[in-house]
């Protein structure tokens, strides 16, 4: 029971070397043993084992799919029928969902077994998983450091082998950054590829769900099950426009067109933005990423210097748009319809004030205030509309190098974050420093492009470093193909933290 990749577990289940119930019990015991990481907010062993037994019956009847019986953990932002769905907040501490999110529904239809709900920054607002009402998550590689956020619980669970895979969400880097900090693989698809129905909203024009696992191959299997048009999500891409059901693993193991097995990436042009390799990049991260790029050159790729000149504007742009959308989305949590309600209050207005004051944490309150300010009369044009204009310019930066007659490269690569994971508590007193940690991921989210992180080595204090791969719209299959080729030539994705 040492295998921890989805592909290996699926093969064991198909060969009847192990049952789904045995797998579920194995991972439930690992979750219990790894409780010190605080990666999970909720586990329901009986519900998990019931799903596992149903998967075993499906396998016995010959109706199994490739994912049937494989366990998975869900970020606690995806509602799951009969399970608590807290979004890491006291505001939703006792909320039990009557329905499944589309992501949960589709993975369940594929036969996957839910292990539990993973910890996260409150309402996905954070880069360290220290903003959770249920306490901070610890990085399995060094318990004094953060795992990244906001999908830190999912990243820590996969890294520590408490789960072979997990779901995450990425608004400004919340799949890629924790994947990098925790030494696993994670992909944020093109905006609209994965349904947001049943995903508790932070910033609706940015939020996107995606898979987190040990390998690119596993992420491809998961994304194939998760993605596709959903009429219940108004932002879901329609069939023929990116919303088709797709086999994202179809190119894995194949050399690029015109290449061969010895040099599978021959002809690939990798763009290196000069803005991603400037003075703000830590030396250990720079060295590790450069070594990974050298490995890709050995596989036949060519490195090309490019520029994304509006990168520096991504932080102020994001921190106008995202809080504005958050202030609107979170207005529904008033203590009346659902969510935390204050025990004592004078009147209705006092109940609203006290319920929200008690239910929301400081970072969420900060972003609600910022969002309400930039949407207010007199400031809407000056801030929000200007930010939306800059957002379009940032998106055009990417198209200038990835598309058109003057296309300079096929994919873009660089670091995921400027540093390795920092120590718990190191940046909580200075939110701006925390925000700067997302400088290399925010622009991709603002543009709606797919991006992923793959393990690329280790930096200071033996902490993982991720290599970021950014593609043009709908190019996830090629990104996964490239990531898989890199992982076939390296073993960073197989490294695990000490028990």
Swiss-Prot record:
It comes from the Bacteria. One of its GO terms (cellular component) is glutamyl-tRNA(Gln) amidotransferase complex. It catalyses: L-glutamyl-tRNA(Gln) + L-glutamine + ATP + H2O = L-glutaminyl-tRNA(Gln) + L-glutamate + ADP + phosphate + H(+). Keywords: ATP-binding, Ligase, Nucleotide-binding, Protein biosynthesis. Signal peptide: none annotated. GO terms for molecular function: ATP binding; glutaminyl-tRNA synthase (glutamine-hydrolyzing) activity. Coiled coil: none annotated. Its EC number is 6.3.5.7. Pfam families: Amidase (PF01425). One of its GO terms (biological process) is translation. Disulfide bonds: none annotated. The active site is at residues 75, 150, 174. Belongs to the amidase family. GatA subfamily. Allows the formation of correctly charged Gln-tRNA(Gln) through the transamidation of misacylated Glu-tRNA(Gln) in organisms which lack glutaminyl-tRNA synthetase. The reaction takes place in the presence of glutamine and ATP through an activated gamma-phospho-Glu-tRNA(Gln). PANTHER family: GLUTAMYL-TRNA(GLN) AMIDOTRANSFERASE SUBUNIT A, TRANSAMIDASE. NCBIfam families: gatA (TIGR00132). Heterotrimer of A, B and C subunits. This is Glutamyl-tRNA(Gln) amidotransferase subunit A.
